[in-house]
From Swiss-Prot:
The protein's name: Formate--tetrahydrofolate ligase
Domain of life: Bacteria
Organism: Methylococcus capsulatus (strain ATCC 33009 / NCIMB 11132 / Bath)
Pfam families: FTHFS
Family to which this protein belongs: Belongs to the formate--tetrahydrofolate ligase family.
Length: 557
């Protein structure tokens, strides 16, 4: 059966009953969206602050491949397995974006027998959070152009506006546009463009805010552009935009509660990409889960060089979170791909390619242990085409590396197939928990922070940038030098070349552009050819998605 067929056969339980029975959340503290989705009230969350925190487990992966690694599937499977062995566990995930759903991925709610449900709702509109983020973002865009049209009292330089528009879709045609065409009645003629919603600073702010007051303050700090002197910033609060933006987000800030196929609880909230944003679910969701459960399993997007680095250096730094251990997801197929095998040949046994691709896993393990300071368990996500010889070789190689590796079959068997992984992780978390370290210190310059990530985590020889980028970073050091850096880089490689597989080293990371996300509280460094508005592939997943006369959706996976 396909993922969606498995999900549609799930026996879901009313979310209000599950929340009360498993986590003790009273019905009055939930805002239900139908029978199987609910938002958790902020006043209830505020009342949890004196409870002790549970233990936080981060799931990440080797560098992604077209073969798929199964990070979300592993997060769900591990959470289900921990509950099966008697550990009270909640999973924390990001909300899927419509762009990839209709583009390449076709969905992002786990897979096989390790999924969160209702799968179709989660993958499509869910509770409307992304819509709210997009509208709040575009309200600010409209207010900027409206202010300029009505006299421009703030002296905003139309050539130095930093705030693009957003839409939750992969649409390359919108990367660069012209607005205000058709005469003066339609506003000031200028260049503009669209980013995807998950790259919006409003999304990052929603994911890092700890309260409604913090949300509003961060929204007000957004720098939309500069005055005609080219130096003086114009803030969203100068346009009196932040109050209305916060009003649009008043429900979006509440975490969403759903269930797995095995009727365990998961919080799905926020959804920044890890290649063009910071790649983590909301701080509110994670902190809430830590107060409600003994164990919290969360994931960070793409490979450990992107999502996990940002989880540590941005999310943990800002929110004071302390992960106890990291699970690194790997597959035999993906490692063979990193070893040079074509996608169509990945189901054939190839120990030589497996050995060549192992360098990718080895570097990620090194980064997690040496640079993030955390114990690591390798979860080998089992595929039916994996041979016994390949599995045995990989297990032995991990043992030689000094890292525990566990074969997990949660895709096929659900939580039962990940019980060995759950016991291994729980043993480390209970008896040998780690204490994370940051890759760089707050006091380092912005240039040095970028360089440190590139050399330590990516294996680069150094970084490069033109004079304009260097001057901009230098100018920001005075007021924003303490900010962490959010790298925007291809997820497919340690380098900026998506075709450089394995563990390339000695390369140069070229920084093409830098952006100041003042409301979020970090600086974005865009490396290589990375785009903040993706495009659709030649054959988008949308071509295979349909709905029948009874409203039953097909084609999501």
């Amino acid at each position: 059966m396909s993922d969606i067929e498995i999900a549609q056969r799930a026996k879901m339980l009313p979310i209000i009953d599950l929340a009360r029975e498993k986590l003790g959340i009273p019905a009055a503290s939930l805002d239900p969206y139908g029978h199987y989705k609910a938002k958790v009230a902020l006043d209830y969350i505020d009342g949890l602050k004196d409870r002790p925190d549970g233990k936080l487990i981060l799931v990440t992966a080797i560098s992604p491949t077209p073969a798929g690694e199964g990070k979300t599937t592993t997060t769900v499977g591990l959470g289900d397995a921990l509950n099966r062995i008697g550990k009270k566990t909640v999973m924390c995930l990001r909300e899927p974006s419509l762009g990839p759903c209709f583009g390449v991925k076709g969905g992002a709610a786990g897979g096989g027998h390790a999924q969160v449900v209702p799968m179709e709702d989660i993958n499509l509109h869910f509770t409307g959070d992304f819509h709210a983020v997009g509208v709040a973002h575009n309200l600010l865009s409209a207010l900027i152009d409206n202010h300029i049209n009505h006299g421009n009292a703030l002296d905003i330089d139309p050539r130095r506006i930093q705030w693009k528009r957003v839409v939750d879709m992969n649409d390359r045609a919108l990367r660069k546009i012209v607005v205000g065409m058709g005469g003066t009645a339609n506003g000031y003629l200028r260049e503009d463009g669209f980013d995807i919603v998950v790259a919006s600073e409003v999304m990052a702010i929603l994911c890092l805010a700890t309260s409604m007051a913090d949300l509003k303050e961060r929204l007000g700090r957004i720098i939309v552009g500069y005055k005609s002197d080219g130096k003086t910033p114009v803030y969203a609060r100068d346009l009196k935009a932040h109050g209305a933006m916060a009003a649009l987000l008043k429900d979006a800030i509440k975490p969403n509660l759903v269930q797995t196929l095995e009727n365990n609880l998961a919080i799905i909230h926020g959804g920044p990409f890890a290649n063009i944003a910071h790649g983590c679910n909301t701080v509110t969701a994670t902190q809430t889960a830590l107060k409600l459960a003994d164990y919290v399993v969360t994931e960070a997007g793409f490979g450990a060089d992107l999502g996990a680095e940002k989880f540590i250096d941005i999310k943990c730094r800002m929110a004071g979170l302390n992960p106890a251990a990291v699970v690194l997801v790997a597959t035999v197929r993906a490692l063979k791909f990193h070893g040079g095998v074509k996608k169509e040949d990945l189901n054939q046994e190839n120990l030589a390619a497996l050995e060549a691709g192992f360098a990718n896993l080895e570097r990620h393990v090194h980064n997690i242990r040496e640079h993030y300071g955390l114990p690591c368990v390798v979860s080998i996500n089992h595929f039916s085409f994996d041979t016994e010889a390949e599995i045995a070789w990989l297990m032995k190689k991990c043992e030689a590396l000094g890292v525990k590796a566990v074969l997990a079959r949660h895709w096929a068997e659900g939580g039962k197939g990940a019980e060995a992984l759950a016991r291994t992780v729980a043993d480390i978390v209970d008896h040998q928990p780690g204490r994370h370290t940051f890759v760089y210190g707050d006091e380092a310059t912005l240039w040095n922070k970028i360089e440190t990530i590139a050399t330590k985590i990516y294996g680069a020889a150094g970084i490069s940038a033109d004079a304009k980028v260097k001057a901009q970073l230098e100018a920001w050091n005075a007021d924003y030098g303490h900010y962490p850096v959010c790298m925007a880089k291809t997820q497919m490689s340690f380098s900026t070349d998506p075709n450089a597989k394995g563990a390339p080293s000695g390369h140069t990371v070229a920084i093409r552009e830098v952006r100041l996300a003042n409301g979020a509280g970090f600086v974005v460094a865009i490396a290589g050819d990375m785009m903040t508005m993706p495009g659709l592939p030649k054959v988008p997943a949308a071509e295979h998605i349909d709905v029948d006369d009874d409203g039953r959706i097909s084609g999501l996976f």
